Amino acid sequence: MRQLFLCISLLLSCSVLSAQSFEEQFRAFQQSARADYESFRDKANERYAEFMRQAWEYYQAAPAVPEPEDDPVPPVPYEDEEQKDDDKEVIIEEVIPTPAPEPQPEPIEPIKLEPQPEPVANKCKFQYFNTQCEVRIPVEINHLRAANSDAFAEGWENLSDGDYEATLYDCLQLREELKLCDWAYLLMLYEMSTTAYQSANNDAMLLCAWLYCQSGYQMRMALDVDKLHLLYASRHAIYNRSYFNLDGYNYYTLLPASNSVQICTAAFENEQAMSLYVLEYPHLQVNKSQVRTLQSERYSQMRVSVQTNRNLVEFYDTYPSSELNNNPLTRWAMYANTPLSREVQQMIYPALRQQIQGLSTREAVEQILNFVQTAFVYEYDDKVWGGDRAFFPEETLFYPYADCEDRSILFSRIVRDLLNLPVVLIYYPGHLATAVAFPEIEQGDYISLNGKRFTICDPTYIGAPVGATMPNMNNQTAQAILLQ
């Protein structure tokens, strides 16, 4: 019996020792992995700072690419006698795909925070499109001693010493909480940095650049005489802004700069260029506009009252118009694929949904079409804005005028949201319309695309029914733009 107890005791002792050994090994592995992560990022920042000390080369900016402008086609009122019994297929030879959006950039390693006592962490409170935000910053923030490459490298090293980890972490948290797209995130970083330094000086620009870089974004820094600039790389070709082409990427200055600047061409690990997709609207503090009532002329029950968020409209006003894959038609898909805010959806969709309830799909689309055709006042962009400008759906509900682009974008958004029907944009030189894929074959002009029949719906052909093409549209030059 005593021998049995002895054996059991030995086994238990071995098990305890084995468990302790395993736990110690696991902890050692964790510490080693953490050290590897930290050394990887630390070394990346060390290499970057060292590269910054080298000579910054002069580069000449490429001239801005103007936004393409066609001679606009004025709206045309529909006459009943124009309705034809025969269907006409619109032959589309070119289809513009919508490139799949990529996930937002991430830091090269997870940002891990150690608890910080209050004296170490201060709060930077700032207004971002009238939305109150705050992030932790060190009590004593860094200041550059000069405006040269050595000072900038020294400043980069100081920012990378660990004191700004909480700042970076909080900024990334705000990106998630406010649903900020890449463009919105960059603007937020700049607003925070200038607030922290109470100035748009070189200190603020370096902090903004460091945070943007550490968040995973592709950027370069430039010196314009003694003024530091952030250059952001974009997957999109941005209109009306000069740029610097470096290693096949276009870089744009966050703030205006001269055409000849010195650039540090150092690249950071796993950097990713900005995307200008707005897959989710920024969740900003709501600042309601005045109530606007919109009503269909033919279907008086299609009537809504809406208040848009001025803060969101103000953000959209900063959005740079751009194209993808050297195709200017891709710009409209970026606007059309942006969702309406939840607040606006809750204001207009219940009323519209109630009015189309019980109707056939064609009748429902026809009422939505007439609503967009007649509830908005048409005006040329040149007259209102001095040049072409497309609206996000939210903007069309805010501004008093809307042209063919704005109407088609809004119509496509409403039909996809309320009826869950596929919609494409149809481009004619000087004009933009839409086509809807109905569950049944409907009468009217149509296009065949990906095995589906899309029936023409033109929100600027005033009073026209589903299936009617505006007169004088050259179908041989029409192109289809796919939407999500």
Predicted regions and their residues:
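Boundary of Sec targeting at the N-terminus
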Residues: 19-20
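Positively charged n-region of N-terminal signal peptides that target proteins for export
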Residues: 1-4
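Hydrophobic/aromatic-rich core segments of domains that either
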Residues: 219-251, 352, 357-359, 406-484
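Bacterial N-terminal signal peptides
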Residues: 7-14
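Long, contiguous, compositionally biased segments that the model treats as domain-scale units
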Residues: 27-30, 34-212
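Active-site neighborhood of thiol-dependent amide/isopeptide-bond enzymes
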Residues: 195-208, 379-439
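Secondary-structure boundary elements
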Residues: 135, 139-143, 148-189, 333-398, ...
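Extended, non-transmembrane interaction/recognition domains
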Residues: 207-208, 212-353
